């Protein structure tokens, strides 16, 4: 194989960069070495699961030792397309290699991807240069202390620094998630000044609906706030108070399953004689799939019998979630600014589209975010390619691929592979979705950031092992410095950074429930908050971080150097994970970067520019 001159990341080869709107012309420029002789290159463009279409490229000229060819194609419908080049005359083709570069091959290789999205796809502008903050409601702040438990099977935890219960560890039914620390709406409202000071502009709340586990992913009543958190009216007051601080709130929408202990299913009988499990004539019966072929007699989420799956195509369920006076309508009317859809890739595309319509009926500024762990443009689930990131479904997704790339960089992985992983998502995602993607280092579903970065690898160890591990105090300085590198990445890459509550004070913890401890309000750890505030403020003031194009300048050894190019300003970000001071050229000048540190430089895009920088 030999290399040829095409790179999808280079605007002189493909313009515009990345995904395009339906009806938007795309120009391809191919440069072929003269020593290949006569060639007749064609672009081979294939819409997903359709037959390929061959487009002959036009010879546009010759420079020493190379021939130039060009073609402009206008995809008219949204969808997922793949392409490569065929030289025809010698039966060789040009396929993608890491970094977007083309390579000549006699055999089949990897196509480039071209995502085409709806021309009217828009996402909320208010989110794009802001900062998100995720709160697990029971574990953030107790505004009304020493609560009486609203249900007898709940355990109140007055010992706020105590470890979450995780027993029984090895029993098949697992632990019950019934210990509650008392976090509530009043506590969140009390801490709004703290969040404002951290430059937070959006709070993402894990589930708040009534449910009978501390995580509240087993919904019992979609239309009622869990009484331990407060009332619907108190939630509305929280949203109003947050708005005065310039902060919006989005909610977790868990619409693929309910709890078995709910007014809809009611297996446990808490809600009287009704419910789909106990009453065949229940209005909720059609929501569920009852069949003796299932181990528990009904379809459940990943086999957990306490989480019966709903049939999202059930008309009455769709109306309940999306209709007037339904779940979405109720909570947006109370002041929420949108939803994050739990397990979005397990929801039918047409159901997501109906949710989108319900959300956007309250204004185009309302947000619909989805939980997707992979590249959302190529995701397949249940035998079907998902279409939710083409402009008629989700606004954006949680950016797990960026998290993986960031952790890989911090753990010493090949930096060129890290750069390719970052650019691949930028190339694949529609710009409106990319600019609202949720960038994070940890969530309630992962190890805490500092544990993932500097802790002993979990490697499948049980909860007892996890409960006995923490980062030694002598290693914390290095761990925090490395964590800052991670924050530098998620705050300066395309998308919206999100801080998981407590990560800013270096709270540790492996998987659930250790990553869900109560916020330590007595912590004296302050080394992360200042840099996070600086990065968040920089995002607000520099237009390069509001949709600016990502370009990799250098990815070599321990150095990852990239720039964001905005309309008015350009930012250069240099990260150095290595143990030595480096000097890297940026904006025509040598810039020193500390060992394990980073530098951000910003200049205006005109001759009389004013530059500034921050160093850690």
What spans do the regions from the language model cover?
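Substrate-binding/active-site clefts of carbohydrate-active enzymes
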Residues: 136-201, 208-334, 355-361
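Short, solvent-exposed loop/turn segments at secondary-structure junctions
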Residues: 138-141, 209-210, 255-256, 337, ...
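Carbohydrate-interacting/catalytic domains
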Residues: 1-136, 142, 148-149, 173, ...
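Aromatic-anchored helix/helix-loop segment that forms the rim or "lid"
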Residues: 419, 423-425, 459-481, 541
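Aromatic/acidic polysaccharide-binding cleft in carbohydrate-active enzymes
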Residues: 138, 382-383, 387-389, 395, ...
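Conserved, mostly hydrophobic/aromatic
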Residues: 30, 135, 195, 205, ...
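Hydrophobic faces of well-ordered beta-strands that scaffold small-molecule active sites
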Residues: 131-133, 203-205, 249-251, 339, ...
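Active-site-proximal helices and loops of the catalytic beta/alpha 8
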Residues: 236-248, 256-257, 262-273, 327, ...
